Amino acid sequence: MNLWIKRALLALGALLLLAALAAMYFIATFDATHYKSVAIDWMKTERQRTLAIDGPVDLSVLPRLAVKVSKLRLSERGRADEFASIDEAALSLQWLPLLRNQLVVDSVSARGVRALITRDAQGQRNIDDLLGAKSDAAPGKTSGPAMRFEVGSVRIEDSSLALRDEQAQITGTVMMDSFTSGRLASGQETPLQFRTTVTLERPQVLRLTFDGKTALTFDAANGSATLRDATVKVGGDSEAVKSLHATLAGNLAWDGSTLTAGPIDVNLSDAKTAALTLGPSTLIAQRLVYSPS
């Protein structure tokens, strides 16, 4: 073997050994209480919010970076009212892809996530401070190539998002009973399954449940996405329609500016209005097109 190759391999081995030793030292000396305090102080100083971490923080760095937290609560800005809480969340990602400007997340899981999004009549939202200031950079210009990312799997259970929008006069809650996905990466098709409940108080009272599955493909570069072989069971009640039970099936595509659907099959099992009782029926739409612009 060439002498320089041997030296390069020895140097690489030494670097890997040093990295492993450094990781072992970091784990051995990791003080969760200290990092909790740092996060709590930063949130209080920079965002004027109170962060509470009542559960343990687990960390591992080899063979991948993995973090697990539980019992988190975050207050509204400048107030003690709860903005969000998490019963349990975990994330793990790979180290080496970061060197190639790639973010490869092995898995993301969360249970018991609760959040409240509000917007007042003037358009101010309670998340504006968390989103940060708008960039002054010219549109279309970036400091470098965008980081590529992929996620091996996502699992969310027993989570909800409450919405109070005074500007749009909407009050409601989206309850995510379960959501699972396969590998999420630009240009790759992945299966999705979900069970969710949407409840509205304004502009009208309704409660709808959705139980569905589909195959998602998205393109991060142009913002397009397709849903293939989507099947969604819908049930619920509203002020106008009671005892709704239906199944929707079909394909959807968004190219960044236009939504195209079709063919779409709507199979109604039953539904009731003030004047009618509807029995089993079917509606087929070969193609639907909607352009917001």
Task: Locate each region found by the language model.
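Extracellular/lumenal glycan-associated surfaces
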Residues: A230-K233, I264-V266
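Short edge beta-strands and adjacent turn/loop segments
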Residues: D54-L65
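Transmembrane beta-strands of outer-membrane beta-barrel pores
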Residues: G112, L200, L268-K272
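Contiguous, well-ordered beta-strand patches that form the walls/edges
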Residues: F194-A221
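Secondary-structure transition motifs
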Residues: R49-T50, A66, S70-G187, E239-T247, ...
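Transmembrane beta-barrel architecture of outer membranes
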Residues: P191, V205-D211, S243-A249, A285
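Short, structured motif recognition centered on aromatic/hydrophobic residues
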Residues: A225-L227, A261
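N-terminal type II signal-anchor transmembrane helix
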Residues: M1-Q48
